[in-house]
């Protein structure tokens, strides 16, 4: 049963990423804007998340997104909400994966 929790947590994490990537893509942010870089980091995380069933495999990309957020985005309320949602989903997936072991 624990493997189902890990799988569903990873699926939820991937869905969270898609939920934030799609609207940003539709907005077509200006090149080199905060939104453009944020979208690039989200896409990198999504690529890693879809390549592996393990949430741990995404840690490096999440660290990159976190560093970008801390350095650049902290004063943008919309991107802050997006970042916090993605981070919470990743942490949930990690906890579910760890409890399965």
Which residues does each predicted region cover?
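Eukaryote-specific, cytoplasm-facing alpha-helical/coiled-coil scaffolding segments in long proteins
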Residues: 38-44, 91-96
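Charged, low-complexity interaction regions
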Residues: 23-34, 50-55, 73-77
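Exposed, low-complexity/repetitive linear segments and helix-based recognition motifs
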Residues: 9, 25, 32, 44, ...
